[in-house]
Amino acid sequence: MSSFITTAVVREALASIVREMRRAMVRSSYSSIIYEGYDFSCVLIDAKGQLVAQSGEDHPFHIIPVAASVTRLLAMHSDIGPDDIFLHNDPYTGGTHLNDVAVVWPVFVANELAYFIVIRSHWADIGGMTPGSLSGGAREILHEGLRLDNIRVPKSGASDTLRLIFDNIRVSDEATADFHAVLGICRVAEERLRRLIDKYSFEVLNQSVAELLDHSERRMRASLRDLPDGEYAYVSYLDGNDPSLFPLQVAVKLTIRDDTAHADFTGTSGQIPAPLNAGPAIAPTSVLTILKSYLDPAGSITSGTLRPITVHAPERTILHACAPAPCGGLNEVRFAADAAVLGAIAQIIPERVTGDVRGTSNHTYIGGFDPQRNKDFIFYEYPSGGTGGWATHDGNSAVRAFNEGENVSIQSTEVVEAIYPLRILQNELRPDSGGAGKHRGGSGLVRKVEVACPEARLSVLSDRNIIPPSGVNGGRSGAPNCFEVLRDGKPIPVSAFPGKVTSFPLRRGDVVVMQSSGGGGFGPAAERDLSLIVDDFADGLVSAPSLAAYGARESAGIVERGMTDLSDEASASIEWRNDDAPAHECGVSAALAQRLGLTHGSSIELAMLKGPSLRAWVDRIEAGNAATVHLSPNLRRFFAGSTVTVRSLGSQRPALTAGTHR
């Protein structure tokens, strides 16, 4: 048995190997999405397929599914050899989306399979229907590129299989260069691992790893034991797109029993022929990410962390998709799953949670031919937004959130203009984007990119363009994401559905405008300190009209408290429906509809002073002169009183048609 000190040293040594891998990736990769965007992750996996080491900087949705990828590999291949490596990106068997390709490098000790070194990185293109492979228009996974389900290739990197892969993707020179960089990094990581084995012995190293996994398990069990037993349900929503007709939902029931947690996603929308699906590894990733972040943020993540947690996501839902469902927007689904689990634990520990984050990756691709450099190009960016406000501080602005690892906010202007036929015209924080609250949500950003080549194509895969990130404990929602193209200074239509653009033709001089959402607010905005409101106004983060949300106003440049009448908020009496309508459908009285400007299909928010806000869509308007809202009995558990604050979210539900998704 290894000693406590030896185990601690081994833990840090393994993490050091992974950190060195990360630094080498940044220094040696060819594509800017790696060396500027940090869209990659590195981990060490043991021979049983268990995650044993990561750097603390890696992306959760990269590293947690890796264990599932390797478990699949072990089931598929019983003849793994020391000269083999494997490529994996298949979302149905532990992958994320097709662009995220994992290189799995086995390590043998005395002819025994000992460990796997894994680097999962985003390839700029993996084939498919559009430059960059990701788009809002995919209807099946074949539209998104090549599926690689643990494809065996030699460690030398020379094979007809690899040639076939690189011959069928765009900008293959970037992918080839990055791939060979990964091979070199894995070789060095194997050398570092062998030195560690030589120093402590293979037996002691395995004993230390076993103790590390057990320690992670004990930490998570202790955190869960502090929570009251019970069942806590919540539903989060995605915008959806044309095939889904109206918002998709991720429903979760989180059951806490002693030192265990079980998340049941029954009630989640069925998979759809659109890129808003995720494979089976994503639901456990969301549950672990939220529980770890809010209950035990210290300490490393290993497969031991997941042992007290069980997850059920029904097959053929957007959280457990099967072929041929496209999964390019798996991160949009993951953000919704994160929000659902966050809404569940906000009912348990409302004082410790935050408002929601921007809720999407905002995949943005501009691709075409660069005549000046005489080659094809693909510019890929995912503009970050605001994070949620919390008990003691405002959210952060234009940064990656806690559930995104070390990925950077945006690529630098200098690098973009040096290697692409593009000009960056504007980078700034987006006014009025952070959700109002006692502690405001962080601001999103505004980024304008001008096309400087004769023609190009734009694809966008985003969410939360209709349904904004929610606040908590009475805090308000952040502004939704927004994408548009300016031609001759005027906006032009680029898609039938917000945030879903497929290969839209751009001309020289067109300007792509990306506006990312802000985070949700924490606590009632009327409780915000006036000095903070003054600072926000002076900094341009809150405009004069938006001061009303804080119970403030501006006069002659002076911000002061004052009586304000909010046009988007009203107190309403609750009446309970006696039909079988789902929880997200509600009725409102004619008086409330007139007060808030609601019509059939309008979306509303039910603000809870303690815990998460709820979302609903108006399916009928009742006669009545009093402000009332007619809710499903399924929501009774959220309400102790007979009134609720109702806010208009300003968005319309595309359709309420019999037989459509609910």
Language model features with spans:
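Generic structural signal for buried aliphatic residues
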Residues: F86, A114, L506, V512, ...
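Glycine-centered tight beta-turn/hairpin loop motif at sheet-sheet or coil-to-beta transitions
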Residues: N111, L609-G611
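Short beta-strand-centered segments at strand-helix junctions
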Residues: A572-A607, R615-L649, A658-R662
